[in-house]
Amino acid sequence: MPAVPIYVKGGVWSTVEDEILRAAVQRYGTHAWNKVASLLPRKSGKQCRARWEESVRPTRQGAWTAAEDATLAALARGGPQWRSVGAALGRPAAACAARWAELTGDQAVAGPAAGERIPGAEGLPAVPEEDEREMVAEARARLASTQGKKAARRARERQVEESRRVARLQKRRALLQAGVNSALPLPRAVRGQLDPNADVLYELAPAEGVFETANEAARDRAAREAYERQIEARGKRTARKQSRAPARAPATEQPALQVRRAIPRPPLELPVPEALLKNSAAPTAAVRRALARLWQGLPAAKNDFDVAPESEDEQPSGSADAAVQSTDMEVLLPWEPPLRQDLPPPPPPPPGLLAEHYRALAAAAAGGPACYDTPDVLRQREAIERALAAEPSPAMLHPQCELPRLPSLDALRAAAQPRPQRRLAAHAATDAGSRLLAYELLPDLATKQREYYVRYTAYELERTAVATRVRRLTAGR
């Protein structure tokens, strides 16, 4: 196996590489420099980008004019940043640097020569033309293809599969000529699918059990014949109906809506329910009685004139209403509102002692004197009250059993008078104590706490220093 040549990324750009770079940028754009570099084995993505931006990019090419030389001189004196200068002039940065070196005679600006990048480039072997031809052929093939890598791979796979299928057919044909029957093996992709040459598509196996198949063909034939006869009969009846159908009405015939309106119809009369026929008079009489009671309950009219009919034609109707009202009033009892009716007279009292007692209770209930407040009863009650007041109250057996005696109203008022003064004095004392605590005691306490903290810290430091001195003196002995 021949040795694989080792390429060093970099080196001088050749004319062929520049042409491949232009074609690759035209195909992949100015953002996929790794794809562009894949067509150039000796160059990286960064080198392809730099070569494109500085030299190969199709900017202004040709001879320099006097105005461009003046602009180049002004920009180069301010700071020779050749990318910015090239963007301002519309030329590559390398061309601007070379032009400035040509104008000033400074070769250090243009950079070293082409052969000075690699030391001892003259002693190295020349690049063989075979590698360059392979690079150009690969770039031409990749740039000329209109399909992607996946599409090309799938096309190759389809060609391989077709060639395999043809080979299997030729092999089977040869075996059949030799007298050996062999089925074509299914590919792996469709191994679990149905084979239309060997299987029955969508076959349903009959259920397990006794199943008679002797008369199955006869039953199928009879069912098909019955269906055909039914279809034929329906078709004949349909044709007969179409032949008997009347002809269509002409376009000038009156619309169906107008014909329907022109036909006279009797008014709709519904039968009256039997319940209303039987009880139709009873509710009317009850309503009339109720209205008559309401009219009787109204107060009497305050005007002293009668309402006379406007014309003589109204008198018969009024007389008829009066007759109806008189007829209804004949069956009604006189009725008055309860507020205007007097109380019924009391029943006659029963004779005897029980009757007297009953009369006394009734009189007391009506608002008269009590039945027991007779003069004798009143005198007896006063005597009992005087006797009870004259008797001295017995001393209590225990002091705790005595009932508390409430002070009089004057005593309570006298005791309540000095309370506002005492409340004001208490408020003043509380205010003075709060001020003393907030403005004097608490600040004094804070000051003393700080002094104590400072002195205690000084004491701790001094005690630590003394302990250190004692320890040193003890160690020195």
From Swiss-Prot:
User: Which residue ranges does the Swiss-Prot or TrEMBL entry mark as DNA-binding?
Assistant: 33-56
Q: Which GO terms describe its biological process?
A: mRNA splicing, via spliceosome
Q: Which residues form the HTH myb-type domain?
A: 1-58
| SMART domains, per the entry | SANT
Instruction: Enumerate the InterPro entries for this protein.
Output: CDC5L/Cef1, Homeodomain-like_sf, Myb_dom, SANT/Myb
Q: Which GO terms describe its molecular function?
A: DNA binding
SUPFAM superfamilies, per the entry: Homeodomain-like
Q: Where are the transmembrane segments?
A: none
Keywords from UniProt, A to Z, are: Cytoplasm, DNA-binding, mRNA processing, mRNA splicing, Nucleus, Repeat, Spliceosome
Where is region (Disordered) located?
233-262
One Pfam family named in its UniProt record:
Myb_DNA-binding
Ranges for domain Myb-like come to: 59-104
Q: Which GO terms describe its cellular component?
A: cytoplasm; Prp19 complex; spliceosomal complex
Instruction: Give me the disulphide-bonded residues.
Output: none
* Localization per Swiss-Prot or TrEMBL: Cytoplasm; Nucleus
Gene3D superfamilies named in the record: Homeodomain-like
Q: What is stated as this protein's family in its record?
A: Belongs to the CEF1 family.
**Subunit-structure text:** Associated with the spliceosome.
Its annotated function is as follows:
Involved in mRNA splicing and cell cycle control.
This chain's protein is named Pre-mRNA-splicing factor CEF1
Organism of origin: Eremothecium gossypii (strain ATCC 10895 / CBS 109.51 / FGSC 9923 / NRRL Y-1056)
Gene, per the UniProt record: CEF1
